[in-house]
């Protein structure tokens, strides 16, 4: 089964205890609109299993992470991001990770800049 943490907001969203504006959901992952969008399209993709950050990923999580990566293009297509998009992970304090549950930001519908912040 998927391990969840009762005090984690993303676990609560993944379990449906807190409502979200869902884009995609299956038994492994959830994608929902960010509450503070930084682009015309800004969604978060999370595993339902609680993994704190990329630093906490183990060998047994590799299939799940690969699965998330295969779903990105489907989610992007659903959102009309045919001109491209950016996938971001913030890890740790310096990476500005604010929620301690692994998540990927998918941003699109505007020209991105480089380097990122």
Predicted features and spans:
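HIT superfamily nucleotide-processing domains
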Residues: 1-117
